[in-house]
Swiss-Prot record:
Component of the acetyl coenzyme A carboxylase (ACC) complex. Biotin carboxylase (BC) catalyzes the carboxylation of biotin on its carrier protein (BCCP) and then the CO(2) group is transferred by the transcarboxylase to acetyl-CoA to form malonyl-CoA. GO terms for biological process: fatty acid biosynthetic process; malonyl-CoA biosynthetic process. Keywords: ATP-binding, Cytoplasm, Fatty acid biosynthesis, Fatty acid metabolism, Lipid biosynthesis, Lipid metabolism, Metal-binding, Nucleotide-binding, Transferase, Zinc, Zinc-finger. SUPFAM superfamilies: ClpP/crotonase. This is Acetyl-coenzyme A carboxylase carboxyl transferase subunit beta. Residues 32-288 form the CoA carboxyltransferase N-terminal domain. A zinc finger (C4-type) spans 36-57. It comes from Lactococcus lactis subsp. cremoris (strain SK11). Its cofactor is Zn(2+). It catalyses: N(6)-carboxybiotinyl-L-lysyl-[protein] + acetyl-CoA = N(6)-biotinyl-L-lysyl-[protein] + malonyl-CoA. One of its GO terms (cellular component) is acetyl-CoA carboxylase complex. It is an enzyme of class 2 (transferase).
């Protein structure tokens, strides 16, 4: 009889505990679902569609400039202009160059606004789209320069212009240079207007600060997306200044429509058709 016997063990699948753990707490990819900020429903991304509108409450999710371009412009019609203009750091603001570089790498944009020329249902127009994923689409010197150049190009070429606004206001890292863009862009809008040309602004969530106080409010026709936040100073600042409680819907697109600041509120899936119609109505047709 052997003094030592080989012990027998029951083999257990080493991955079993991991599998059981995953079954109890399955990992769901972050990009598969989205939570609506308004109704708090969890929505399957595919149900949002390319318009990114909540199917439960019609809340308009914030979208990038490239996503909006795909919704509004004719396919492959957009020709981007005035790229390669870089922001400087006039105040030597700590960390600003690094922030710009990181944001450019993350978004694939060179600045907070895309500018160029496109067609919408065959109607040619100059087009600018702000992108809130780029430092909250704050207006610095490059945003002001690109927009000014676009208005000058539209004036020379006798083109209408459409600007989609979305901004947290002036870019604090550029100080007074940023604030000067309000006057600069407004002057360019005025020259375009003096030439008898058509200008549409579409206010999207959020449009605030110096952008609201300048070119966003100067459109011949001002449209807005539903429930967009539109204003200059923040609600809390205003309440502390005037010492009054403001209405719940204060600074919402619907409030502004009721008080004459906005001409119409247009659903995102109807914007393309509405813009094409407005361009057609305001385009001169040469007599044949």
């Amino acid at each position: 009889m052997a003094l030592f016997q080989k012990k027998k063990y029951i083999k257990i699948n080493p991955n079993r505990s991991i599998i059981e753990k995953q079954a109890e707490h399955p990992e769901v990819p972050d990009e598969l679902f989205a939570k609506c900020p308004a109704c708090k429903h969890t929505i399957y991304q595919k149900d949002l569609g390319k318009n990114k509108v909540c199917p439960n409450c019609d809340y308009n999710f914030r979208i990038t400039a490239k996503e909006r371009l795909a919704i509004v412009a004719d396919k492959d019609s957009f020709v981007e202009m005035f790229t390669g203009i870089d922001s400087k750091n006039p105040l030597d603001f700590p960390g600003y160059p690094e922030k710009l570089a990181a944001t450019k790498a993350r978004t694939g944009l060179d600045e907070a606004i895309m500018t160029g020329v496109a067609t919408i249902k065959g109607q040619k127009t100059a087009l600018a789209i702000m992108d809130s994923t780029f430092i909250m689409a704050s207006m610095g010197t490059v945003v002001g320069e690109k927009l000014t150049r676009l208005f000058e190009h539209a004036t020379t070429e006798k083109l209408p212009i459409i600007v989609f606004t979305a901004s947290g206001g002036a870019r604090m890292q550029e100080g007074i240079m940023s604030l000067m863009q309000m006057a600069k862009t407004s002057a360019a809008v005025k020259r375009h207007s003096n030439a008898g040309l058509f200008y549409i602004t579409v206010l999207t969530d959020p449009t605030t600060g110096g952008v609201t106080a300048s070119f966003a409010s100067l459109g011949d026709i001002i449209l807005a997306e539903p429930q967009s936040l539109i204003g200059f100073a923040g609600r809390r600042v205003i309440e502390q200044t005037v010492r009054q409680t403001l209405p719940d819907d204060f600074q919402k697109a619907e409030f502004l429509l009721n008080h004459g600041f906005v001409d119409a509120i247009v659903k995102r899936n109807e914007l393309r058709q509405k813009l094409a119609l407005l361009l057609e109505l305001h385009t001169e047709v040469e007599n044949v």
